[in-house]
Amino acid sequence: MLSIPEDKVEQYCDDLGGFLNSVESIQSVNTENVRPLHSILEDTQLTLHFEQTTVNQDHEHILDHSNNVQGGFFTVPKQISSHTNSQKSNKNNSIDDEF
């Protein structure tokens, strides 16, 4: 069961009503003489090429392609997230505080 804050119920109902109206509008389209489309590329000739993987042991050469390297690894920006009830109960599982 979903838990919706009381002050958000009206907004959620409006949003859901909008989604349902959109679905109803789509379902009302006459598709009687429309051929089913299995892929957007079904009428396009695809040129296949041979792909080959290689093992690259030159770790430093790979890291040279980035400005964000520290200690021999790529670095990424810290992710800041809002704390929800599940995050508060799992404080030990949060890696955000480690970096």
Curated annotation (Swiss-Prot):
Enzyme Commission number(s) of this protein: 6.3.5.-
Note: This protein may be expected to contain an N-terminal transit peptide but none has been predicted.
Segments for region (Disordered): 78-99
Organism name: Dictyostelium discoideum
The encoding gene: gatc
UniProt subcellular location: Mitochondrion
Function: Allows the formation of correctly charged Gln-tRNA(Gln) through the transamidation of misacylated Glu-tRNA(Gln) in the mitochondria. The reaction takes place in the presence of glutamine and ATP through an activated gamma-phospho-Glu-tRNA(Gln).
Keywords for the protein's UniProt record, in alphabetical order: ATP-binding, Ligase, Mitochondrion, Nucleotide-binding, Protein biosynthesis
Subunit organization: Subunit of the heterotrimeric GatCAB amidotransferase (AdT) complex, composed of A, B and C subunits.
Pfam families attached to this UniProt entry: GatC
The protein's name: Glutamyl-tRNA(Gln) amidotransferase subunit C, mitochondrial
